[in-house]
A protein has these predicted regions:
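Conserved phosphate/ATP/ADP-binding segment of small-molecule kinases
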Residues: 65-147, 156
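Conserved N-terminal subdomain of the carbohydrate kinase-like
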Residues: 1-59, 63-64, 209-228
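Short, small-residue alpha-helix embedded
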Residues: 92-93, 158-181
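Structural signal for hydrophobic packing residues in well-ordered secondary-structure cores
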Residues: 5, 9-12, 38, 42-45, ...
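Charged C-terminal helix
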Residues: 182-229
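Phosphate-handling active-site elements
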Residues: 145-147, 174-188
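Glycine-rich beta-alpha junction loops
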Residues: 26, 56-58, 90, 125-128, ...
C-alpha cells in the first residue's frame, strides 16, 4: 500500500484531493499508513475530508477483523475522521456501550462527536422500537442535529456484501456535492432501497449475492425516480 500511495503522489497533486474514504482494513498497520498519508493530504488541502467506515463487525456476526483494529478505530481513526459511518454494532464497539434504543444511539454519537468527527451516519439501526420488517439509518452532527429515516427491511439469503461500503460512498458523495445532512441522508436511503429491491429481484432469479449496482445505476445518476413510498 505504501507503493500504491507513493505512485499516487507522483501523478496527483495532494492539494487536489477533496476527500479520503476508507473501509475494510486488513490490520492496524495499514491504518497507520493511511493516517500518515492523510496528514500529508490535509497539510496540502486543509479542507479535505476524511470519511471513515470503521468496518469491524455486525450484529449476529460479532467482530470479524483482527484484534488490533477495534482499538485502532476507537483511538486513532476516530479523532482523525471528519465523518464516520459505523453500523449499530460498530457504534457500540467505538463507545464501549450497548446501543439498544434510539436514545442509546444519540448518546453514543455524542460521545464520538466529542472525539472529533462532526458528522456520523449510523448505517443500520434496529432499536427496541423498530419493527422486524423495517430498518433505520441515523445521521447526526456535532451541532446536535439528528435525523432518522426508516425503510423496508428486505430479507436476503445469502446477505449481499458491500451494503455498508455503498451507503458510505453515496452519503459522502452527496455531502461533497453540497447537500445538507438531512438531504444527504434522504438521498442515500432512497438509492439504497432501490438497489436492495433490484438485488432482491436478481437474487430470487439467480441466487447471486452481489449488489445490483450495475442494474440499478440509473438511480445513482438520477435518471429514475427514487422516491420512497
Amino acid at each position: 500500500i505504501r507503493d500504491v500511495l507513493a505512485g499516487i503522489r507522483e501523478h496527483l497533486d495532494l492539494s487536489e484531493i477533496d476527500a479520503v474514504l476508507t473501509g475494510y482494513m486488513g490490520d492496524e498497520t495499514l491504518g497507520d499508513i493511511i493516517l500518515q498519508t492523510l496528514t500529508d493530504i490535509k497539510r496540502a488541502n486543509p479542507e479535505a475530508l476524511y470519511i471513515c467506515d470503521p468496518v469491524m463487525g455486525d450484529i449476529g456476526r460479532g467482530i470479524f477483523v483482527r484484534e488490533g483494529l477495534p482499538p485502532f478505530f476507537a483511538n486513532k481513526a476516530t479523532p482523525a475522521a471528519d465523518i464516520m459511518t459505523p453500523n449499530q454494532f460498530e457504534l457500540g464497539l467505538l463507545t464501549g456501550k450497548d446501543v439498544l434504543t434510539y436514545d442509546d444511539a444519540i448518546a453514543a454519537c455524542r460521545q464520538i462527536h466529542d472525539k472529533g468527527p462532526r458528522i456520523i451516519l449510523v448505517t443500520s439501526l434496529l432499536t427496541d422500537g423498530t419493527n422486524n420488517d423495517e430498518i433505520s439509518m441515523l445521521a447526526s452532527s456535532h451541532e446536535s442535529e439528528h435525523y432518522v429515516v426508516t425503510t423496508p427491511r428486505l430479507s436476503f439469503n445469502p446477505e449481499p456484501n458491500g451494503s455498508g461500503d455503498l451507503t458510505t460512498a453515496l452519503f459522502a458523495g452527496h455531502l461533497l456535492h453540497g447537500r445538507d445532512l438531512k438531504a444527504a441522508l434522504n438521498a442515500t436511503s432512497q438509492t439504497i432501497v432501490k438497489v436492495f429491491e433490484e438485488t432482491k429481484h436478481i437474487q430470487e432469479l439467480t441466487g447471486s449475492r452481489e449488489l445490483a449496482i450495475i442494474q440499478a445505476q440509473d438511480y445513482f445518476r438520477g435518471d429514475k425516480s427514487s422516491s420512497l413510498s
